[in-house]
């Protein structure tokens, strides 16, 4: 499996607001987890171009991440800018 519990804990530890492995609810940690999953699905779709169900799942993940980024932008712009810079996302 590409997303083990150890990988999730590491993502949460490096990107969460509390900087702990149990910080799963903050928008930053969720955005980082979605970004990891999006990167994995993008690589999968480069090989399997006709996998339309995965393509649909990828679009849903991108939408969820976009909504979280919009929420973070409206509430705390400094945290939004930090996560954009940290994950190398483009607006």
UniProtKB/Swiss-Prot annotation:
InterPro entries in the record: Ribosomal_uS15 (IPR000589), Ribosomal_uS15_bac-type (IPR005290), uS15_NS1_RNA-bd_sf (IPR009068)
Stored CDD domains: Ribosomal_S15p_S13e
SMART domains the record matches: Ribosomal_S15
Alphabetized GO MF terms: rRNA binding; structural constituent of ribosome
Keyword S-adenosyl-L-methionine listed: no
Key words, A-Z: Ribonucleoprotein, Ribosomal protein, RNA-binding, rRNA-binding
Pfam families: Ribosomal_S15
Subunit comment: Part of the 30S ribosomal subunit. Forms a bridge to the 50S subunit in the 70S ribosome, contacting the 23S rRNA.
HAMAP family: Ribosomal_uS15_B (MF_01343_B)
Purpose of the protein: One of the primary rRNA binding proteins, it binds directly to 16S rRNA where it helps nucleate assembly of the platform of the 30S subunit by binding and bridging several RNA helices of the 16S rRNA. Forms an intersubunit bridge (bridge B4) with the 23S rRNA of the 50S subunit in the ribosome.
The protein, known as: Small ribosomal subunit protein uS15
Taxonomic source organism: Cytophaga hutchinsonii (strain ATCC 33406 / DSM 1761 / CIP 103989 / NBRC 15051 / NCIMB 9469 / D465)
Organism phylogeny: Bacteria, Pseudomonadati, Bacteroidota, Cytophagia, Cytophagales
């Amino acid at each position: 499996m590409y997303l083990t519990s150890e990988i999730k804990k590491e993502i949460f530890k490096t990107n969460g607001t509390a900087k702990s492995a149990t910080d799963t609810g903050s928008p930053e940690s969720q955005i980082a987890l979605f970004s990891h999953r999006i990167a994995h699905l993008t690589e999968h779709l480069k090989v399997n171009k006709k996998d339309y169900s995965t393509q649909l799942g990828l679009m849903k993940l991108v939408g969820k991440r976009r909504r979280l980024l919009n929420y973070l932008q409206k509430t705390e712009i400094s945290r939004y800018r930090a996560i954009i810079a940290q994950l190398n996302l483009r607006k």
